[in-house]
C-alpha cells in the first residue's frame, strides 16, 4: 500500500469531495505488540495522534502466524483493540477500527520457496482469531485470506514476489477487494484520472515515509540523537525540526492528490515549509566531539594529485577512472563495494541524511 498506492488511489477517485488523508504506519516485520524500531522512536499511539487518525485499517496476523499460537495472538489483539478504542487521536472521538485478516500464502511452484500449504493452515487459524476478536469487540472485520486464495487461483500471473509479499499487480487486485468490502461497490479501475491520481499518491507517500521511517533513525530518535556539538546543538535539535518540515511538505501533497482526483493539476506549494535550523560546523575544533586529528584537512587534493601521492608496489600503476569532477552526482559517497562481475559500485547520498540515494557503477 505504501509503495503501490492502489487502495488510496481508488478511494480518492471514488470520493473526491471528501478530501481523504491516508497515512501508512506499517513496518515490515511488525506484530501487534512487537514493532522493531530505533530506541526512542515515537510510540504507535502518539504517532496515530500525529496523524489525527479517524479510521484505522489494521493488518495484523501474517507475521504472528509464524509463532503458531493463534490463542496468544487473539489475546494480544483484543488488548490492542481495547487500548485503541480508548484513544481520541483526532482530539474528538474514538477511532473506527477495521481488522483485516492476513492474506494467504501463494504457491509459486518454485524449488527455492515453500509452497505455503503448511503455513496456510496457520494463516487460516489467525484469520479466524482476528474475526473472533472483531466480533467480540464490536469492530469491523474484512476477510482477505479467502479472497486472496481466489485471486491466486484465477490469476494468469503470480501476484506475490515470494509467496507472501504482493507485487504491484497483486496489490492492485487486493485493493479492489478491500475497496468493495469497505464501500460496498466496485473500485473505479478505469477512471480517467487514475494515473494522475496514483502518481500524486505515490509522491505523497514517499514524502510521508521519509518522515515516518527516516533514514538513520538512530540519529533522529535513537542513541545518537542526544549527541551535542557546537554550542550544545544536538542531532535531535536539527533532525526533529526536519520532521516538521516534511510534515508540511506531505500535507501540501495531500492537496495535490485531492486536486488530481478531480482532474485538476496543481504543483505542491512548499512556501509554508519551516526554514531549516542552521547547523553550526564543527570544523576547527569547536565541537566537543571533534579535534584537529579527527577532522584532517578539509582541502581535498585533486584526483591527479592524489595519484601522485600513492606508494605502489613495483609493476603497479594507478589511474583515475572516476571522480566527482567527472561525475558531479557522485558527491557524498557513503559506501563502495565490488560486485560479483568485478564492477565497483558506489552509493551516494546527495542530500544526506535523507530523501535521495543513488547507486553508480
Each language-model region and where it sits:
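Serine-esterase "nucleophile elbow" of acetyl-processing enzymes
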Residues: 1-26, 44-52, 56, 174
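Conserved catalytic region of serine esterases and O-acyltransferases that act on ester linkages
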Residues: 4, 157-299
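Extracytoplasmic/secreted envelope proteins and their assembly/folding machinery
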Residues: 4, 8, 41, 45, ...
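Beta-propeller domains with acidic blade repeats across secreted/periplasmic ectodomains
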Residues: 21, 282-361
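A short helix->loop->beta-strand "cap" motif at the edges of active sites that frequently abuts
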Residues: 85-96
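Structural recognition of the beta-strand scaffold that forms the well-ordered cores
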Residues: 21-26, 54-60, 96-101, 140-143, ...
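Substrate-gating cap/lid alpha-helix
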Residues: 107-144
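Solvent-exposed loop/turn segments at secondary-structure junctions
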Residues: 1-2, 27-33, 55, 61-67, ...
